[in-house]
Amino acid sequence: GHDWGDQYIRRTGQCLRDNTPAGTVCARLSGDEFLVLFHGYRSRDAVREKIDCLTKAMQQSVALLPSGNALHISLSGGIAWYPDDGQDWETLKKYADFAMYQVKHSEKGRVEEFDIGVYNREAYAERTRREFRQLLSNAQVFYCFQPIFSARSGRVVAYEALMRSDLPTLRSPATIMKLAREQGALYEIERLTFTKALETFDSLCRAGSVSGDAMLFVNSIANTCLSHEDGKYINSHWHELCRRMVVEITEEEEIDYEALERKRNAPGFSGMFALDDYGSGYSNENTLLQLAPRFVKVDITIIRGIDTSPDKQQILRNMVAYAHPRSMKIVAEGVETAAELRTVIELGADLLQGYFLARPAIVPGAIAPEAAGIIQELQRRKKD
C-alpha cells in the first residue's frame, strides 16, 4: 500500500545519501524519481566510477516488506553531461530523463548515458506519429496524376493517382503506409485514398484538365476492404468514375483472395484490377492466376536498362506472350529513356508510363514531344 511505497522511497533516499560523496546534490523529484548532481570532477571516468559504486550499493540495499521479507532496491537511471549534452539545467534534466526512460523501456536496473543520436531518432519518430494522426484527422493528402499512354498511338488512356503529403516527415507514401500498418490505420488510409483520389480527379475532369474518357488507376491495400456503407458512399458520389476505375494491387504480404473478390464486387466498381510491380519479387504467378487482372504493370527493375539486357527482354517477351491471349494488357512502368521506350514497344507492351513520357503532376501534362515522335516513328515502320 501507500505506507509500504513511502518506506521504499525513504530507503532509496537513504541509500543515495549514504553512498554519494560529500558535496553531491541528491533530491527527490516526484514519485520514485530522484536526481543526483555530481560536480567538481576532472573527468567523466571519475564520475562513472562513483556512479558504479552507487549502483552496486543500491543493489545490495533492501527494504523490508510488511511480511518481513526483504526486497532489493533496483535502480534505473540516465546520465547527461555538462557542458557537452547541455549547458542549462532544464536541458540536462530533460536529457537525463530521456536516457532513464530508454532504460525503463528496455532492460531495467541499468544506468545509461544520454545519446543525442537516439534522442533525435526518437524525437523524429514521435513527430512522425503526431503528423500521421494529423494527416488522418484533417485528410492532409493531395494527389498527383501520372498519365499512362497507348503504345500504338501515344494517346492518354489512363492516369495513376499518386498520394502526396505536405507534412514534413510524411513526404513519402512508403512512410505513410509503414505508420498505417504500425498504428492499425490501414482502413483509414484505404478510405482516404479512394475518396480523395476520386474527388480530385473528378474536379480535373470537370475543369477539362484531363482526358474525359480516361481510366483512373488507384493504389489499393490488398487485404483491406471498404465497408458496404463506404462503398455505397463512393459510388453515389463518383458513379461514372467508379466505372472507369482500375484498382492497383501490389503483393507485399500474403493476399486474402476473398478480400479481393469483395473489392471486385464493390458497388459500382468496374471490376478491373492491375497487378502492380510484377517481376519485383512480390508479385508472383499465383497472384497473377488468382487475381486475373486486366492490366499487368511490369516493375521498373525489369524496364530499367531493358534495351541492353537480353534477359530482361526475354522476361518481357514471355509476359506479353502470356498476357495477350488472356486479354490482359502489359503496362511498361518506369520508362526513363528513349532506348527503353523503343525496346518495350518493339517487344509488345500495350501501355507506357514513366518520366520519359510525362511526370506526375497535380494537373498532368501531355506526352513529351520526343516520346510522341518515337511512338509515331515505330508505328510508321510497322505499317511500312
Question: What is each PLM-predicted segment?
Answer:
Residues G1-D18, A27-G31, L35-V36, D45-D52, ...:
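Conserved long alpha-helical elements within nucleotide-processing catalytic cores of c-di-GMP signaling
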Residues A27-L29, M58-L75, K104, C205-G212:
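Catalytic core regions of nucleotide second-messenger enzymes
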Residues P83, F98, Q102-C144, R152, ...:
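C-di-GMP signaling machinery
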Residues V157, Y187-R262, G334:
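Catalytic core of bacterial c-di-GMP phosphodiesterases, primarily the EAL and HD-GYP domains
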Residues A151-R155, S165-T169, S209, N219-C225, ...:
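EAL-family c-di-GMP phosphodiesterase catalytic domain
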Residues H2, R48, S67, Y82-K108, ...:
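Catalytic-core segments of nucleotide cyclases and related cyclic-nucleotide turnover enzymes
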Residues L37-V47, L65-A70, S74-L92, G117-R121, ...:
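Catalytic strand-loop-helix junctions within cyclic-nucleotide turnover domains
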Residues G13-R17, A46-S67, K94-Y95, T193-C205:
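Alpha-helical scaffold within the catalytic cores of cyclic-nucleotide enzymes
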